[in-house]
């Protein structure tokens, strides 16, 4: 599991794209020229940006070679760069930085967010959506299984929180719109939950394990999911998935 798997990620493309659609709907810009899609993945969010601003110069950034290859194939009219978000520098100031479900993987948000604001034009917008599920059973159980099986903690850090992000971005000279939504995804089985998180949150826990170690981890994880996520009357499972949204417009 040395690289991200675009096919696995796109297995739940409708569910993953919905927050991007809702984030984009709140971006208060009509005409833009320069746009960056940070953590663009296979290009599903980039496609939304291109659809809204077909004449804009849109650059997708991702550290995964497989994701970049998939995005380039799907969107030949956009530019894609394989790079670390923290180190990438645009050639010109940006009108919009769009980051859908990517910045949660990066540390030091108290430094990262002001840095991103500094890349914007005056009145430019930083639009961010991040999964806020560190305390959800899906992610708590990952840590518990790792502890049981004597593996080091490989999960991402919890988000800084609504009040912290508001202060960070206000102090960086932005007007801030921030909100949190919990989606309830209908899952046909506990295995479907595993399929979902294997493409994202579970990936760091599995990537350095042998095949047999992965199987032991997933078997135990499946058992614990069954305890935490009961079936509905129709046999479906409701997977709660909170997400944090931020639209920050530069005013200084």
Curated annotation (Swiss-Prot):
InterPro entries for this protein: Methyltransf_25, SAM-dependent_MTases_sf, Trans-aconitate_MeTrfase, Trans_acon_MeTrfase_C
Reactions catalysed, as given in the entry: trans-aconitate + S-adenosyl-L-methionine = (E)-3-(methoxycarbonyl)pent-2-enedioate + S-adenosyl-L-homocysteine
Keyword Cytoplasm: yes
Residue ranges of the TM segments: none
SUPFAM superfamilies, A to Z: S-adenosyl-L-methionine-dependent methyltransferases
Any one of the GO CC terms: cytoplasm
The protein's Enzyme Commission number: 2.1.1.144
CDD domains: AdoMet_MTases
GO BP of this protein: methylation
GO molecular function: trans-aconitate 2-methyltransferase activity
Keywords: Cytoplasm, Methyltransferase, S-adenosyl-L-methionine, Transferase
Compartment(s): Cytoplasm
Residue runs in coiled coils: none
Role summary: Catalyzes the S-adenosylmethionine monomethyl esterification of trans-aconitate.
Family: Belongs to the methyltransferase superfamily. Tam family.
Protein name: Trans-aconitate 2-methyltransferase
Organism name: Shigella flexneri serotype 5b (strain 8401)
Name of the gene this protein is made from: tam
């Amino acid at each position: 599991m040395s690289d991200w798997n675009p096919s696995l990620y796109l297995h739940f493309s409708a569910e993953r794209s919905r927050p991007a659609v809702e984030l984009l709907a709140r971006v208060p810009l009509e005409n833009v020229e320069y746009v960056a899609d940070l953590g663009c993945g296979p290009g599903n969010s980039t496609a939304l940006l291109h659809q809204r601003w077909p004449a804009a110069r849109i650059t997708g950034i991702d550290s995964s070679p497989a994701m970049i290859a998939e995005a380039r194939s799907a969107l030949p009219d956009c530019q894609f760069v394989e790079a670390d978000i923290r180190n990438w520098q645009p050639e010109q100031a940006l009108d919009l930085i769009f980051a859908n479900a990517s910045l949660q993987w990066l540390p030091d948000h108290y430094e990262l967010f002001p840095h991103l604001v500094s890349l914007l034009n005056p009145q430019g917008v930083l639009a961010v959506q991040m999964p806020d599920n560190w305390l959800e059973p899906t992610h708590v159980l990952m840590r518990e299984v790792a502890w049981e099986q004597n593996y080091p903690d490989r999960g991402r850090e919890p988000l800084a929180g609504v009040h912290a992000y508001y202060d960070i971005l206000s102090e960086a000279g932005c007007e801030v719109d921030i909100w949190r939504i919990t989606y309830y995804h209908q899952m046909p089985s506990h295995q479907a939950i595993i399929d979902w998180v294997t493409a994202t949150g579970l990936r760091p826990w599995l990537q350095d394990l042998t095949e047999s170690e992965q199987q032991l981890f997933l078997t135990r994880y499946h058992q614990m999911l069954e305890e935490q996520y009961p079936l509905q009357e129709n046999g479906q499972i409701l997977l709660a998935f909170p997400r944090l949204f931020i639209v920050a417009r530069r005013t200084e």
